[in-house]
């Protein structure tokens, strides 16, 4: 995912609008005293095996007994009901017994989902939904009176409907889409929201193949390969079929439906989005998709999923992106008219290997997904844009984000560890940039330790060995040590023995800081220095050869000046570098923050206009806070005007920021 902390805050706000996100983090941390860390995990690893060869439950965020039963195939027969805003239908789980008739019940995760009936091997069965506990929800217990022989597969068919408390689905009104003609829906199951769609073994430690049979009045996209010949007309509705033949964890189950058009953007890729955005989206991605895929394949090995498509969500999508297989779900702010923000796509594509093919077995080892993905993303982009300086430039930006995150948590905080105990913790609450950037730094440190040439041989070995499987940090360590114990690497023996695995996995705070190649960043800071002088005359050529991210680093440096720019300087900045006219929301937003700080009133309407075009919280919340400081009336007017356009989570956050929420009024 590419959410960078926003998901966690948004979710918390939704549940408890009057509390601050930092409080949730503190209370979450205090819920897990240090002596309990990893106890669940260790119990599973050391003592949990009651039957020989049975893999233990090692994910504290599931209540399922997946040590006794494992889902092998899932069939989702679901109807998307836009009027009632729910999914209804049946889901069939095919579970393989891991014991020899020892287990007499199947326990599944569920959360705010209505179960109407459950059949076991086509016969009505005894089942019960047990009381809800946080953060893991309400387990569904299904009796299997005779048990099943080891290796035998039983079929569990569940009739169900989602509820209005479902945490996995977002329903947009026509007003929240760009052509305002039809409603739109999409799912977001990471981390533990799949259980809110249907009862399942909602753990990344279990992988299943999928059949999707989805009925909707609008076009459907799912995390499987479309089976177009089998789309059936059912009067007002259509049945859309998809297949996912690569086993995937539950958090990668994904659906979206609405007025969706598609256009090719590469040999294996199409872009799907609203008809109004199709042309611009196609232009933005065309040409680069094949390059990204080829670069990634060169680093790891050939792409194994068939198609790689991108679904660009409506402007009110509040997040960055989600690596749902076959169809990455992406923020529309990547469509910036300058191809400068599509690094999100390199990130989500990299997940096709790290995360989707090779998966962390629980959210405690999430860095295996995101740290590796940041590493691959930077390798992909460096190979396309030309080398190490680009890699380091991106890593420098990441390091800054990591420093900020660790500063915000406090450097002793549990959530600043690479491996984070999740006992009693909702993974969304522990979500931050830490697993991304601290994970990246660990992977990169191993790369530098053994040398690029050697590390490049390890990469396909690791991803090959763990394809279609899930692993923990210790299995990663074992794999690394095993690979480099080969005789041809004997000269690396001392270096490898020097790796502080325990320190890397369990220390809080920043990891050791590497030497960066700062050449691409230095020019940004040098230009910013020049702007400190009031008589500096800017010229478009100052930034003409720069990437969008370089301009961003420069703008952030200017924003951090002790003294704001004068109104004249700020206007000259916008004009000389084409910032006020830019379609790039990243650059435009950064510029408007400088303009607002300079009290350049001529820019305020531009801020208001931008706030009517983007719904990604990364931009919306800071812009509203900025506008509120300089022109509260315009801020309130802009919010009222766009209220229906924003996603409910975003709307609620902005209400709080502007002090117009009901909670704020009553307190
Ligand atoms: Zn990611």
Swiss-Prot record:
**Which reaction is catalysed here?**
an epoxide + H2O = an ethanediol
Q: What is its main location?
A: cytoplasm
Cofactor(s) needed for function:
Zn(2+)
Cellular component GO terms held in the UniProt record: cytosol; fungal-type vacuole lumen; multivesicular body; nucleus; NVT complex
The record's top EC class is hydrolase
Q: Listed GO molecular functions?
A: aminopeptidase activity; epoxide hydrolase activity; metallopeptidase activity; zinc ion binding
Keywords, A to Z, come to: Cytoplasm, Hydrolase, Metal-binding, Metalloprotease, Nucleus, Protease, Zinc
Question: Per UniProt, where does Zn(2+) bind?
Answer: 347, 351, 370
User: Active-site positions, per UniProt?
Assistant: 348, 436
Q: Which InterPro entries match?
A: Aminopeptidase_N-like_N, Aminopeptidase_N-like_N_sf, ARM-type_fold, LTA4H, LTA4H_cat, M1_LTA-4_hydro/amino_C_sf, M1_LTA4H, Peptidase_M1
How, per the record, is the cofactor bound? Answer: Binds 1 zinc ion per subunit.
Q: What is its EC number?
A: 3.4.11.-, 3.3.2.10
> What role does this protein play?
Aminopeptidase that preferentially cleaves di- and tripeptides. Also has low epoxide hydrolase activity (in vitro). Can hydrolyze the epoxide leukotriene LTA(4) but it forms preferentially 5,6-dihydroxy-7,9,11,14-eicosatetraenoic acid rather than the cytokine leukotriene B(4) as the product compared to the homologous mammalian enzyme (in vitro).
Q: What is this protein called?
A: Leucine aminopeptidase 2
The organism of origin for this protein: Neurospora crassa (strain ATCC 24698 / 74-OR23-1A / CBS 708.71 / DSM 1257 / FGSC 987)
């Amino acid at each position: 995912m590419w959410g960078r902390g926003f998901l966690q805050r948004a979710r918390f706000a939704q549940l408890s609008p009057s509390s601050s996100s930092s409080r949730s983090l503190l209370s979450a941390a205090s819920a897990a005293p240090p002596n309990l860390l990893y106890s669940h995990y260790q119990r599973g690893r050391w003592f949990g095996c009651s039957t020989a060869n049975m893999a233990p439950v090692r994910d504290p965020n599931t209540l399922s007994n997946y040590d006794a039963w494992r889902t092998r195939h899932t069939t989702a027969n679901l109807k998307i009901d836009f009027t009632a805003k729910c999914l209804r239908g049946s889901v069939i789980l095919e579970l393989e017994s891991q014991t020899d008739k020892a287990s007499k019940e199947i326990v599944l995760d569920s959360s705010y989902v209505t179960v109407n009936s459950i059949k076991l091997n086509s016969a009505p069965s005894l089942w019960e939904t047990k009381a809800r506990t946080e953060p893991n929800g309400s387990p569904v217990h299904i009796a299997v009176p005779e048990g099943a022989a080891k290796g035998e597969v039983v079929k569990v068919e569940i009739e169900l409907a989602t509820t209005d408390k479902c945490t996995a689905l977002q329903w947009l009104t026509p007003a929240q889409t760009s052509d305002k003609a039809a409603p739109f829906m999409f799912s977001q199951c990471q981390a533990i929201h799949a259980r809110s769609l249907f009862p399942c073994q909602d753990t990344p430690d279990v992988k299943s193949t999928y059949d999707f049979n989805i009925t909707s009045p609008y076009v459907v996209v799912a995390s499987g390969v479309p089976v177009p010949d089998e789309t059936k007309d059912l009067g007002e509705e259509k049945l859309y079929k998809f297949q996912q033949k690569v086993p995937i964890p539950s958090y990668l189950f994904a659906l979206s439906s609405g007025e969706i058009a598609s256009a090719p953007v590469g040999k294996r890729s199409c872009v799907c989005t609203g008809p109004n955005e199709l042309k611009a989206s196609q232009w933005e991605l065309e040409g680069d998709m094949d390059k990204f895929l080829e670069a990634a394949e060169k680093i790891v090995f050939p792409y194994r999923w068939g198609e790689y498509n991108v679904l660009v969500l409506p402007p009110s999508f509040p997040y960055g992106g989600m690596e749902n297989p076959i169809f990455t779900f992406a923020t529309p702010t990547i469509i910036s008219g300058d191809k400068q923000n599509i690094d999100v796509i390199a990130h989500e594509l990299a997940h096709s290997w790290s995360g989707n093919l090779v998966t962390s077995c629980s959210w405690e080892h999430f860095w295996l997904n995101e740290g590796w993905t940041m590493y691959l993303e930077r390798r992909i982009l460096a190979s396309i844009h030309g080398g190490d300086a680009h890699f380091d430039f991106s890593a420098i930006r990441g390091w800054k984000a990591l420093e900020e995150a660790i500063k915000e948590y406090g450097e002793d905080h549990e959530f600043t560890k690479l491996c984070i105990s999740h006992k009693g913790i909702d993974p969304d609450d522990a979500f931050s940039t830490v697993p991304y950037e601290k994970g990246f730094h660990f992977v990169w440190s191993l790369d530098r330790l053994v040398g690029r040439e050697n590390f490049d041989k390890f990469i396909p070995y690791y991803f090959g060995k763990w394809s279609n499987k899930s692993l923990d940090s210790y299995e990663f360590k074992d794999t690394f040590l095993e690979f480099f114990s080969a005789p041809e690497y004997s000269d690396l023996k001392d270096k490898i023995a020097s790796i502080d695995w325990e320190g890397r996995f369990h220390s809080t705070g920043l990891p050791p800081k590497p030497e960066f190649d700062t050449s691409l960043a230095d020019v940004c800071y040098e230009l910013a220095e020049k702007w400190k002088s009031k008589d500096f005359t800017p010229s478009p050529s100052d930034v003409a050869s720069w990437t969008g991210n370089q301009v961003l680093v420069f703008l952030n440096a200017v924003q951090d000046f002790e003294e704001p720019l004068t109104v004249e300087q700020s206007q000259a900045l916008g004009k000389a570098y084409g910032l006020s006219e830019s379609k790039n929301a990243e650059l435009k937003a950064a510029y408007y923050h400088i303009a607002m700080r300079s009290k350049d009133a001529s820019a305020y309407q531009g801020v208001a206009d931008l706030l009517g075009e983007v719904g990604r919280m990364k931009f919306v919340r800071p812009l509203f806070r900025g506008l509120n400081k300089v022109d509260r009336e315009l801020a309130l007017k802009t919010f009222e005007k766009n209220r229906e356009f924003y996603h409910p989570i975003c709307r609620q956050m902005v209400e709080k920021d502007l002090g117009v929420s009901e909670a704020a009024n009553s307190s």
